């Protein structure tokens, strides 16, 4: 048997090593010129006006919610089928996460579900662009505008994703992730884009101790060595080591996503003859970033449960992932919201399985996964 095929592996090369070496030799390794270049590059990529690099997308979500003054007594609408960090940040600020159901086949939160969940206490809506495909963000943003509610796009899966001809994050506020498995990575990191100048200014303060400027800004412009604390803030800045890696990855984005698309197409063709159900694609015009390739493993239909399939793949030297276990089924949220029922979310949470998908995979690697799936389906 070949070596273990992981669910994901970052596509790192000599360019990333050279970028890190350049920063280490520059004498400026924390937040500095590479951060500024990364922020400018994302403004160019998305077409938005402001970009703020942070240490993680979770950090970005935290300070965005804070900047919007979300706290005790407020409600924030979000799908349950998302990474729990969003729910955690809402809860840690004293607000209430209002979890809504998703479309059964795309796993996208719908405008209808969002609007039905709005109350006088709703202060924000957080739609998720899921697995590399976009939610219907125009319709969701229209709801936010109609009710005067902020929309924060969870774009953690969305680098290289386009919706109706525009890159995700072209307007409004969106948060991207550079975590190790994302389409571009710098190990850990994130970035917020926004067209709200006041929000951008608050985010820059909140990410760096509540100061109006950072160390590089003082170094570059000769500002006073002791900056003024304007508001209590956090230490959520991104180092230039990480930013340099992200910049190098961004140059490769088209190539990386093209390879992801080729592997996804290979899976799609093979799955047409198998009982495992891939996600449906959104009906609106889009370019898929193929962050994840997810199948649904229904035991009655497939003759094997999701958990058994993942274990069988592991025995064959193939990794798989679960994106995600529904947040409202996790212990803390289950106890906090014991009567919450989200049928589509729960059905999928029990069946979804993410197959290996990363740019350095070969055609033979994908064939190996397909062969294993055929065997497990009894073919």
Swiss-Prot record:
CDD domains: AHBA_syn. Gene3D superfamilies: Aspartate Aminotransferase, domain 1, Type I PLP-dependent aspartate aminotransferase-like (Major domain). Its EC number is 2.6.1.87. The keyword Transmembrane does not apply. InterPro entries: ArnB_NH2Trfase, DegT/StrS_aminotransferase, PyrdxlP-dep_Trfase, PyrdxlP-dep_Trfase_major, PyrdxlP-dep_Trfase_small. Keywords: Aminotransferase, Antibiotic resistance, Lipid A biosynthesis, Lipid biosynthesis, Lipid metabolism, Lipopolysaccharide biosynthesis, Pyridoxal phosphate, Transferase. It is an enzyme of class 2 (transferase). It comes from the Bacteria. One of its GO terms (biological process) is response to antibiotic. The modification N6-(pyridoxal phosphate)lysine is found at residue 182. The keyword Transferase applies. Pathway: Nucleotide-sugar biosynthesis; UDP-4-deoxy-4-formamido-beta-L-arabinose biosynthesis; UDP-4-deoxy-4-formamido-beta-L-arabinose from UDP-alpha-D-glucuronate: step 2/3; Bacterial outer membrane biogenesis; lipopolysaccharide biosynthesis. It catalyses: UDP-4-amino-4-deoxy-beta-L-arabinose + 2-oxoglutarate = UDP-beta-L-threo-pentopyranos-4-ulose + L-glutamate. Homodimer. HAMAP family: ArnB_transfer. Catalyzes the conversion of UDP-4-keto-arabinose (UDP-Ara4O) to UDP-4-amino-4-deoxy-L-arabinose (UDP-L-Ara4N). The modified arabinose is attached to lipid A and is required for resistance to polymyxin and cationic antimicrobial peptides. Belongs to the DegT/DnrJ/EryC1 family. ArnB subfamily. This is UDP-4-amino-4-deoxy-L-arabinose--oxoglutarate aminotransferase. The lineage of its organism: Bacteria, Pseudomonadati, Pseudomonadota, Gammaproteobacteria, Enterobacterales.
């Amino acid at each position: 048997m070949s070596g273990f095929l992981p669910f994901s592996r970052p596509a790192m090369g000599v360019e990333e090593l050279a970028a890190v070496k350049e920063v280490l030799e520059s004498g400026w390794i924390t937040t500095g010129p590479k951060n500024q270049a990364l922020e400018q590059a994302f403004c160019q990529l998305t077409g938005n006006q402001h970009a703020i690099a942070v240490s993680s997308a979770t950090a970005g979500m935290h300070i965005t919610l804070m900047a919007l003054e979300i706290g005790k007594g407020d409600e924030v609408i979000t799908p349950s089928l998302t990474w729990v960090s969003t729910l955690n940040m809402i809860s840690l600020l004293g607000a209430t996460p209002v979890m809504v159901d998703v479309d059964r086949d795309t796993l996208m939160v719908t405008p209808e579900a969002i609007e039905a969940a709005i109350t006088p206490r709703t202060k924000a809506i957080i739609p998720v662009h899921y697995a590399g495909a976009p939610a219907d963000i125009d319709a969701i943003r229209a709801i936010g505008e109609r009710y005067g509610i902020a929309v924060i796009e969870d774009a953690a899966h969305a680098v290289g994703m386009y919706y109706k001809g525009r890159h995700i994050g072209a307007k409004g506020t969106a948060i991207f992730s550079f975590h190790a498995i994302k389409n571009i990575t710098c190990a850990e990191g994130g970035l917020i884009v926004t067209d709200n100048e006041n929000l951008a200014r608050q985010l820059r303060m909140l990410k760096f101790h509540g100061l109006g400027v950072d160390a590089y800004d003082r170094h570059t412009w000769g500002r006073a060595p002791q900056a003024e604390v304007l508001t209590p803030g956090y230490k959520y800045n991104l180092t230039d080591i990480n930013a340099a890696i992200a910049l190098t990855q961004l140059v490769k984005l088209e190539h990386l996503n093209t390879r992801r698309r080729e592997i996804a197409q290979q899976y799609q063709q093979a799955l047409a003859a198998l009982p495992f159900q891939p996600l449906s694609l959104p009906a609106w015009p889009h370019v898929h970033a193929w962050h994840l390739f997810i199948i649904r493993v229904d035991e009655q239909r497939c003759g094997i449960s999701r958990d058994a399939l993942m274990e069988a793949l592991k025995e064959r030297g193939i990794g798989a992932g679960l994106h995600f276990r529904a947040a409202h089924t996790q212990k803390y949220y289950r106890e906090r919201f014991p009567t919450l029922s989200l049928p589509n979310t729960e059905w999928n949470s029990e069946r979804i399985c993410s197959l290996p998908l990363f740019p350095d995979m070969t055609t033979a690697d994908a064939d190996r996964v397909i062969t294993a799936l055929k065997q497990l389906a009894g073919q």
